[in-house]
Amino acid sequence: MLAATCNKIGSPSPSPSSISDNSSSFGKGFHPWKRATASSCSLGSSLSSFTRNGGGLSDSFGTNTSTGSSAFSLTSGTSSNSHFGNDYSVFQTSVSNNSQEPSHQPMFISKVHTSVDSLQSIYPRMSVAHPYESWFKSSHPGIPTGDVGTTGASAWWDVGAGWIDVQNPNGAALQTSLHSGGLQTSLHSPLGGYNSDYSSLSHSAFSTSASPHLLTTGQHLMDGFKPVLSSYPDSSPSPLGGAGGSMLTGGPTASLAGSPRSSARRYSGRATCDCPNCQEAERLGPAGASLRRKGLHSCHIPGCGKVYGKTSHLKAHLRWHTGERPFVCNWLFCGKRFTRSDELQRHLRTHTGEKRFACPVCNKRFMRSDHLSKHVKTHSAGGSSGSGSGASGGKRGSDTDSEHSVPGSPSCHSPDLLQAPESVPTTGMNGRASSLD
C-alpha cells in the first residue's frame, strides 16, 4: 500500500533540471527518491536540499544530480564527513569525491519506500521479515553496520534457550541463564561494554541450584548457630545441664549425653540433676541406690554446701550465685527483678495492697504467709501468759503487718480491720476468766 501511494505521488513530479542554482526565486517541488548512480549508498536516506548559493536561496524538495540521492540535505561548505556519522551511521550517504557541488549532510530519514524489492536493494543485509532490525542495531554506535542481519531471519527479539544474552561488538557474550529453561532475549545493546563487570554472575545469580561460592559464607555463618551443648537422648530436660551449669563449675562439666551409664538413670518419675550428690549416685551405679532414695541435692559451689530436697529449689538457689534474676516486675516505673517467681508475686502485692492471708480467729489479713503463721501463734499461747500475753501478741501481730507493708499503699489499714485487734483480747480475757471461775 505504501509503495502504491509513493508511485502515485512520484508520477506528476517536475524535472529537477527546472530549478537553477543561481535563481533568486524559490522553486518548490516534490521529487521521488532515486538511487544514486555515481555514488554507492549502502544505507542511504532520502533527504531534501536546502541550498544557499550567492544571493539566491533555493528551498526545494529536489535532488542534486551530481551528488546522487539526497533529500532534506544541508550544504556544509567544505566538510565532506558528517559529524553524525558515528552516532547515526544508518543515515550516512556516500558522496562522490569528484563532485563539483558542496557535500550534503543527512539530517532526516525518509519513510518513503517504493516497493519491497527496493528495500532489499537499498538494504541488502536486512531481512524482509524484520524491516526495523538494521535501524535498531545501527542506532547504537558500538555495533558496526556490517553486522546487521548477518544471522539471516533472526531478529533481536528472538527467543532462545537462556534468559539474557547481551552481545558486545567484539563478539563476547554475557549469558546469565536459568537452569530451569525459559526465555533468552538477545539484546544487541551497549550493555556489551559491561561484559567484564557482570561476567561473574554467569550461572550463579539467577540460577535455581545452589552455587558453591555463594553459599560458602552462609554455611560458615550458620555454623555459629549450632547448639553448643548436645541434648539428652530423652525428652526430659535437665534443670542444671544448660548454659548455667557450665558457667557455674568454672571448668568442663561431665557430659552425661555421651556417657553410656547415663541411660541407667533415665527412668520415669525422676528429674535429671547434675548436683554432686546425683553425680556420685550415678558413678556408684547400683550401689548408689541409697543416695537416690534420700533425694538430696547439694550445691556444688565450694564453701556453700546447702542441700535441697527438690531440684527446682536448688536451681533457684544457684541463681543467687550467678546473679540471674529472670523475673521482672512489670509495674509502672518499677522494673525490679527477682530470682524466684514467688518473690515476684509477693512484691506485686506491695503495689496492689492485697492481703490474701487471713487469720481464722480474728480475721486479720496479711500479705505474707509467714506473717500469718506468726500471728496465729499469738492465739495459741499458753494460759499462764494471761491477758498481757494476749495483748502483747496482738501488738506483735500488728507491728509485723505494718512493718512489711509499703507506706502509702492503698487500703493498707481499713477501719474494720483496725477494730479487730481490740475485740480479740476482750473475748480472750472473758473466755479465760469464765474458765478460771
Curated annotation (Swiss-Prot):
Presence of the UniProt keyword Transcription in the record: yes
Pfam families: zf-C2H2 (PF00096)
Residue ranges of the motif 9aaTAD: 154-162
The keyword Hydrolase is assigned to this record: no
Listed Gly residues bias regions: 383-395
Subcellular location: Nucleus
Keywords, alphabetical: DNA-binding, Metal-binding, Nucleus, Repeat, Transcription, Transcription regulation, Zinc, Zinc-finger
Main localization (coarse): nucleus
Location of region: Disordered: 1-24, 232-263, 373-437
GO molecular function: DNA-binding transcription factor activity, RNA polymerase II-specific; double-stranded DNA binding; RNA polymerase II cis-regulatory region sequence-specific DNA binding; zinc ion binding
Zinc finger (C2H2-type): 297-321, 327-351, 357-379
Domain of life: Eukaryota
Compositional bias segments (type: Polar residues): 424-437
GO BP, sorted A to Z: embryonic limb morphogenesis; embryonic pectoral fin morphogenesis; positive regulation of fibroblast growth factor receptor signaling pathway; regulation of transcription by RNA polymerase II
GO cellular component: nucleus
Function of the protein: Transcription factor which plays a key role in limb development. Positively regulates FGF8 expression in the apical ectodermal ridge (AER) and contributes to limb outgrowth in embryos.
Comment text on domains: The 9aaTAD motif is a transactivation domain present in a large number of yeast and animal transcription factors.
The family this protein is said to belong to: Belongs to the Sp1 C2H2-type zinc-finger protein family.
Protein name as it appears in the record: Transcription factor Sp8
Organism: Danio rerio (Zebrafish)
Name of encoding gene: sp8b
